[in-house]
Amino acid sequence: MATPVVSASGPPATPAPAPVAAPASASASVPAPTPAPAAAAVPAAAPAASSDPAAAAATTAAPGQTPASAQAPAQTPAPALPGPALPGPFPGGRVVRLHPVILASIVDSYERRNEGAARVIGTLLGTVDKHSVEVTNCFSVPHNESEDEVAVDMEFAKNMYELHKKVSPNELILGWYATGHDITEHSVLIHEYYSREAPNPIHLTVDTSLQNGRMSIKAYVSTLMGVPGRTMGVMFTPLTVKYAYYDTERIGVDLIMKTCFSPNRVIGLSSDLQQVGGASARIQDALSTVLQYAEDVLSGKVSADNTVGRFLMSLVNQVPKIVPDDFETMLNSNINDLLMVTYLANLTQSQIALNEKLVNL
């Protein structure tokens, strides 16, 4: 499999340089890279027409063209074809919603990285609607970086995306992620490639080095900047990152959080009865908090909040009104059914064990 190579330095591909910027919080222009024969870099823009006579005279005729055609104004670059995700302005009020599986997958890829690799990169997948951009899946992409160039296995990325579409056809390419706390010049080159896969791609950075004592997670979207008719740059503007989860993901996150209090960072799986007991304890704690808040409001210690009051009223109205005697009857009936199922399961297990012994005689 051929690995496309993107050079991070060298002369510009066209007479007019097309610099891009790679700041983490500010913009700075760098010369556009010159792609290798199998390069995957975004082609540099065609030279813009200049009103300077000296600049026009310095333009040489291409092979097969007359001097008149060589001095004609350069054509405007064709607009990029729209991708499947993030159409138009960034939706959702510039908010990106991340699921816990994304962070777990990124950290796992970083722990399994090749020897000598400073960071890992990958593709972000998810869904887009009018109100939010939700990142629900991702996969890592092999790459190599040096001071002068970056090589990304883009064929691998395309094949992985095709496989993901067979399982989750609704997931689209939203952008890419990288481990680290800043944005480098190589990040700009990789971002240009993903700009061809999806308009307004998201760049997610995860600080796995824990420089500030915590895993900083930031999201950016690129914005063109510069003087019209001159060299253009790219500025990465931050986005708001929020966390979303499904019920099954929340259970896993709660279990992982328990390892924070374990000396060896290992915790065993609890039984069904223990899970029911833990859930009941959490509900009791929540009810105690709500009751204390209501008492503080009635006593004047805390000012009333209309939003909280409406939410509590809606919650109370959702509780079905059942006579205590009827509720006890229903509970006892369910318990009897559960005990009967348990008894039959144990009886079946005993019969199977007895049958195996009779067969082996």
Curated annotation (Swiss-Prot):
Quote the EC number.
Answer: 3.4.19.12
Please state where this protein is localized.
Answer: Cytoplasm
* One matching Pfam family: JAB
* Residues carrying N6-acetyllysine: K242
Which terms does the record give in the GO molecular function aspect?
Answer: cysteine-type deubiquitinase activity; metallopeptidase activity; translation initiation factor activity; translation initiation factor binding
Q: Which GO biological-process labels does this protein carry?
A: formation of cytoplasmic translation initiation complex; proteolysis; translational initiation
* Cited InterPro entries: eIF3f, EIF3F/CSN6-like_C, JAMM/MPN+_dom, MPN
Q: What does this protein do?
A: Component of the eukaryotic translation initiation factor 3 (eIF-3) complex, which is required for several steps in the initiation of protein synthesis. The eIF-3 complex associates with the 40S ribosome and facilitates the recruitment of eIF-1, eIF-1A, eIF-2:GTP:methionyl-tRNAi and eIF-5 to form the 43S pre-initiation complex (43S PIC). The eIF-3 complex stimulates mRNA recruitment to the 43S PIC and scanning of the mRNA for AUG recognition. Deubiquitinates activated NOTCH1, promoting its nuclear import, thereby acting as a positive regulator of Notch signaling.
Question: Which family is annotated?
Answer: Belongs to the eIF-3 subunit F family.
Record's protein name: Eukaryotic translation initiation factor 3 subunit F
